[in-house]
């Protein structure tokens, strides 16, 4: 079954999180997300607000311990921003972010993949 992907706010930046098949936290910036996540936009927005306020203190100086991907368009293609030396597990993530990440379980581990095509069986 294919997951429907949709961008909640075309033309605007937004962040959302997922957990990969190995239990690591993955951050996605911009681009589309699984449509069912959009029913939880209040939680996604709360997590993004938390991240904006506390990420520098929580995650430390760059590079952050996150598998982070960004999208520069409406297509479900995300490119990696960095490869963390010691990636953060979902169980170690702040509660606001972990609640959102737990809603989207990726079927694969991001590992050292540089490009994620969400419409290619990842979600």
PLM regions with names:
Residues 1-44:
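Short N-terminal edge-element motif at the start of the domain
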């Amino acid at each position: 079954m294919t997951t429907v992907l949709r961008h909640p706010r075309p033309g605007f930046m937004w962040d959302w999180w997922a957990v990969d098949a190995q239990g690591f936290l993955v951050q996605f910036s911009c681009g589309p997300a699984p449509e069912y996540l959009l029913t939880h936009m209040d939680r996604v927005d709360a997590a993004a607000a938390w991240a904006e306020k506390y990420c520098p203190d929580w995650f430390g100086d760059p590079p952050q311990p996150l598998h982070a991907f960004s999208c520069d368009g409406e297509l479900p293609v995300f490119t990696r921003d960095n490869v963390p030396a010691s990636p953060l597990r979902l169980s170690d993530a702040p509660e606001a972010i972990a609640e959102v990440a737990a809603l989207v379980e990726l079927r694969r581990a991001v590992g050292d993949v540089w490009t994620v095509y969400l419409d290619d069986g990842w979600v």
